[in-house]
Amino acid sequence: MKVTVDQAFWDLFPTARITVMSLYGIDNTVDEAKDPYFKELLDKGAKRAWEFIDEENYTQSEFVQEWRQAFSKFKTKKGARSSIEALLKRVHQGREFYPINPLVDLYNSVSMAYALPCGGEDMDKLVGGLSLGQAKGGEPFFPLGAEEDAPALEGEIIYYDQEGAVCRCLNWREAQRTMLTEDTKDAILVIEAINLSLIHI
């Protein structure tokens, strides 16, 4: 499947790096009672995440500040924060992470271990390829559990396909329509970096 990054994104973030991995024919199920591998992976990611957190105030982390600055460069929904900030906040609060499904657990553990936003979509649910760019405004978006449309704002940075927004505010919230589930067979995973000097891989 074709993945496109529009020039409007590069105009805002000329030093960014968007890494994409395509997976085909996968089994996205696991019996956690018999195989606790993904719970252990999440625990390891959360433990390593402390390397990127100020014990007194997680918001002072340079990784959190980096993404807050990035979000200030485009139109966002009030209160929207990057996915990595949400994960680091949960770690700082001492909250436990429980498995969702193997692919989601994998990208969440990588995200915490390296302080990089990671995400993924069900390739078979995308229509006409995946793009990252600036919203025209009004692209339909239904997050998990929502019954009402929460369309993208004009100028917002979003992932989108021919049917609408796939992930809003770059990496803030994804659509239920294309999210990874245990039924997913083909998937696209994405890792985002805005400031290459902060990559710890």
Where are the model-predicted features located?
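Conserved alpha/beta core surface patches that mediate binding of polyanionic ligands
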Residues: M1-V5, Y160-M179
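Gly/serine-rich nucleotide phosphate-binding loop at the start of the catalytic core
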Residues: K2, F9-K44
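A generic local secondary-structure boundary/capping motif
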Residues: Q7-D11, Y98-N101, D122, L144-D149, ...
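Glycine/proline-rich, flexible active-site/cofactor-binding loop segments
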Residues: A33-L87, H92
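Conserved phosphate/anionic-ligand binding catalytic regions in large, soluble enzymes, centered on
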Residues: E96-G120
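Class I SAM-dependent methyltransferase SAM-binding "motif I" and its flanking Rossmann-like core
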Residues: S111-G138, E156
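A structural-propensity feature for long, helix-poor, extended segments
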Residues: A135-C167
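Conserved small/polar residues in nucleotide/adenosyl-binding loops
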Residues: I199-I201
